[in-house]
Amino acid sequence: MPGHPRDATLTALLRRELVREEHPPTAALIRALAGIHARGAFTRAEFKLMCRWKSPRARHLWETNSPARIRAVSRAVLATRSERRRMELLTGLHGVGVPIASAILTLIDPRRYGVLDIRAWQLLFSLRSVTTNARGQGFTIAQWEQFLSELRRHARHLRVSARTIEYTLFLCHRKFQRGLLYARSERRLRRSNTAV
């Protein structure tokens, strides 16, 4: 059971808003990737599907990874028991930052992982479950580890997957958000409004 007073608000929110149904296209992708663990690696085509799901705009970067490099990295990721090492290996691929790496792990094993996303992070920050990076941008591996720990703790308490917790946080943030998501976008919008 979560033990910090700050957890009461988050636990109540999660209980009230818990989303047990996966987004249908995401559920289909997770099913399509189900054989990865048995093979012990993912293909370049699977890698591209996972990256596109999280960040299609970075395509020009992650598409430059060779099939051999992707295969070697994916084998090492699936072979190690170290969460930090998994993240280090994945972020060693061109165009793969911590959010995309977290998405890859989530799509492969949604029971244990959730996507590190600006929305989920900002909601956790507003509830003081995480205490750094208020904007939820430029994530570090240490922040991902903290995020993952929070997801897993609440997942155990509510007897659901880490992905269920993360997806619920994502949708709650979307539901309750005020203003623009990215601070840089707000500044750009203000500048363009003053120029008119």
Regions found by a protein language model. Name each.
Residues M1-C51, S55, G114-V196:
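C-terminal accessory module of base-excision DNA glycosylases/AP lyases that mediates lesion recognition
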Residues H4, I36, A79-R84, P99:
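Residue-level detector of functional hotspots within protein domains
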Residues V19-H23, H37-R39, S66-R75, L93-I104:
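Short charge-dense sequence patches
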Residues R31, R71, R85, I100-L105, ...:
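Generic alpha-helix detector with strongest preference for long hydrophobic helices that associate
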Residues G40, T80, R86, L105-T106, ...:
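Homeobox/homeodomain signature
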Residues R52-V96:
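Helix-hairpin-helix/helix-loop-helix acidic hairpins
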Residues R81, R111, A142:
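A short glycine-/small-residue-rich loop at the edge of a beta-strand within enzyme catalytic domains
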Residues R85-F125:
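Catalytic DNA-binding helix-loop module of base-excision-repair DNA glycosylases/AP lyases
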